[in-house]
Each structure stands twice: as structure tokens, then as C-alpha cells.
């Protein structure tokens, strides 16, 4: 009997010890598992926090600039001054490219991989000297072609007079004023334009009017920037109203984009703002206008900013006579 009691007591004690071990070890195992899981999550988070960087390499002005940036971020591409003999157009991944850049100055580049950029330089010596005499006469559907603009338009007129003689102006008129923009157009330019149109009122053929204003209203004054969006809105509002008057006078209307400049040569104009102005204005002009995208044409094929009318200097804004003739030729072909 005593033996039996001892046996029962021993079994009970054994069972109790097993239970104690189970309840002691289980929480430790659970904590260990939890700790392992937490550690794994921390390691994963640590890996996720590791910033992946890419290198943007730019060769400019005889030096190589390397910039490390976060993958997926954006960088604003710089501009470069025009050296003697060429116009800087933008950037490309191809060395030695002379026109049609992949990227333009002040363009936002989305970086997802390492990239090496080279300047795209248009050599002035490669610009063709085209003949444009008689080009306007080939556009038979218009009785007259009127260009409206600023100093660039005035220099276009001077180029045609020098290169082709006064006869080329028989079918063309120019309403322009150096250094002016929308305010001048409202106060003086509109009246001058209608005076020119009045000379053709008796003709059955239409008059083509090509506007090329805007670059002077994008000037940074006193170090202050400019809102190209609001400037474009002001232009669109006025031009759309003017178009309704002009279409009743048998006119067909065109707006030629503000053409490129080089901010490094002319800090008061910014290339990205010219592009922004062109895009906004094109969207907001009404159906009475047809858009002439000479900006893209010049970027694709190149242009020269060594201007004969400025003492053969390069101010980054005004063009050579060869470029002006090419702009004129492009515009005439677009209105045919």
C-alpha cells in the first residue's frame, strides 16, 4: 500500500514537472520566434531604406561633371554658352551630334539609369545659304502675306531686302517694332495691320497674316521671373478677339512660335519659358489660327546666332541672315 502511494506520488510529481517545463518553454519559444520575425522585418526594412543612386555625367566647356542622384528623381539640365563658330542646342547621349538634341537646356530629365550626356553643337559653317527669291509668288492663293512681329521680324525684312532686292516685298508687308510685344500690338500694331489689309480689300484672294510676337514679353526684368502661363493667356485672349475681326476682312491667320534663344548668352530669357509659352499659346488660340512650329524646325536642323545686324556678334537671341532665310522659307511652305 505504501509502495502504491509512492508510485502515485512519483507519477504526479513527474506530470507536474512536465507541465511546468511546457508553460516555461512555450513563451520563450514564442518570443524567440517573434524576435526572429522582427529581426527579419528589420533587415528587410533596412534593405528597402537603402537608396539606389545613378550617375549623370555631363561633358561641358572642356570639363566633365558627374552628379549622383536618387534613382527615379529628376535633374534640370544646364545650358552652355555659344563658343565661336557654333550654337549650343542641347544634350545627347551621342558624342559629336550637331543638331536635333535628345534633351534641351532646362529640361527636366527623369533619371532611372546612369547616363552620359554630350553637348549638341550646330556649326555655323554647316548652315546652307538658300535662295528664297520668288518663294512668296509661288503661293498663288494669297494676294498678300503680312508678317507681324518684333526685332526678329524686322531683321527678316532686312534680310530679304538685302539678299533678294525690293521686288521680293511686292507681295509682302511687315508690321513690326524692335523690342516690343503685346502692349505695342494693342496700341499701334493693330492699326498698322488693318491699314495694310485695307490696301488689299478690293481683291478676291485672301491675305495671309503671320504673327511672331512674344519673346519680349518673356524678359526677366529687375531680376524677377516671369509667368509664361499668364503671358500666354494674355496673348490668347487678345489674339482670339482680334481673329474675329480679321476673318471678316478675308484674312487667313497663322501664329509662328517664338523661336529659340540661348539663356547662357541672354540671361533675361529662359529657354524653358519660351517652350512653355509656345505650348500654352498653341493650346489656347482658337480655330481661326494655324500654328507654325518653327521652334521645333530650328532645333531639329540647327540655327546660327551670329547676327550681321548686330555687328556679327552673338547675343543668343538674333539670327544670321542664313537662318532668317530658312525661317522665312519654312513659314511660306507651311502656309501653302
Model features per residue range: what roles?
Residues 261-336:
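Catalytic His-Asp segment of secreted/periplasmic serine-dependent ester chemistry enzymes
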